[in-house]
């Protein structure tokens, strides 16, 4: 999810397929696929990353090229994932071994995607179709619009526009909330964790949970994680856009 800068994402074993994303764009990267990314813009960049299934996938699997190039810089990756920097005098601890590069047979087990296949994994800011789902909290529909962005294709009431990256489900949904002026969701709660990532604009936030109340204003790049069951409201102060990440493949509807 690109917040700032222009980012090149590339994939497959040969790293030759690519696409460039700009601020507000989002990409859903499939599991079991080599990928990389780099800031190709002229300003300092920043991306948000969402990992599915409440874990990091058991660690990172590095392409052979990465391990070999690291050696050229004096860096040795160990089998346990730790990094040894020989340029500052570090040595491989006793009993530890360098991570061997993957064999051609192992490399052949990774999935390969064409640009056309990956196009279904990319969402472009400004191109989303408004959601027709009636369960979103919205007291100002004239100024507040929701979008179904990432989620299962068979989700009831939603028409997600970006394909999930995991064939077994990501265990999260991503929605967009856009304001053309001041607005208000009204107070609501969810039985799942909900994270709000502000792309642009200012949003007044109120959150009540276990006897405590938080009132704050989020601006460009700010994040808030709403606990399960917390009562919250979101009030844009003007034009803006934010992503809402909700846990679960099929989360329950918000309660108002």
Regions of interest found by a model, annotated:
Residues 1-23, 30-33, 189-220:
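A short beta-strand-loop-beta hairpin characteristic of the jelly-roll/cupin
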Residues 4, 32-34, 42, 182, ...:
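A generic structural motif
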Residues 24, 30-32, 179-184, 220-221, ...:
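Tight coil/turn sites that cap or link beta-strands
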Residues 34-121, 231-256:
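Double-stranded beta-helix
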Residues 38-39, 179, 184-185, 197-198, ...:
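Long compositionally biased, domain-poor regions of proteins
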Residues 77-178:
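A short, N-terminal "cap"/entry segment at the start of jelly-roll beta-barrel domains
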Residues 158, 173-191, 228-229:
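Conserved short histidine dyad/triad with adjacent acidic residue
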């Amino acid at each position: 999810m690109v917040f700032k800068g222009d980012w090149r994402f590339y994939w497959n074993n040969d790293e030759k397929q690519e696409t460039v994303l700009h601020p507000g764009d989002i990409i859903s990267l499939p599991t079991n696929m080599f990928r990389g990314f780099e800031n190709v813009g002229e300003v300092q960049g920043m991306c948000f990353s969402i990992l599915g299934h409440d874990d990091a996938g058991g660690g990172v699997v590095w392409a052979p090229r990465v391990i070999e190039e690291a050696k050229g810089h004096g860096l040795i990756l160990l089998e346990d994932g730790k990094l040894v920097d020989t340029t500052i005098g570090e040595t491989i601890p006793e009993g530890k071994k360098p991570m061997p590069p993957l064999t051609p047979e192992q490399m052949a087990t990774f999935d390969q995607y064409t640009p056309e296949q990956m196009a279904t994994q990319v969402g472009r800011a400004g191109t989303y179709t408004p959601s027709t789902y009636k369960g979103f909290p919205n007291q100002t529909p004239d100024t507040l619009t929701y979008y179904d962005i990432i989620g299962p294709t068979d989700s009831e009431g939603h028409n997600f526009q970006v394909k999930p990256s995991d064939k077994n489900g990501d265990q999260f949904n991503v929605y967009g909330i856009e304001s053309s002026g001041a607005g208000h969701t009204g107070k609501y709660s969810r039985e799942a964790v909900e994270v709000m990532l502000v792309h642009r604009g200012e949003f007044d936030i109120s959150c009540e949970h276990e006897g405590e109340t938080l009132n704050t204003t989020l601006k460009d790049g700010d994040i808030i994680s709403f606990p399960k069951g917390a009562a919250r409201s979101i009030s844009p102060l003007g034009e803006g856009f934010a992503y809402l990440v909700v846990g679960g493949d099929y989360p329950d509807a918000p309660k108002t």
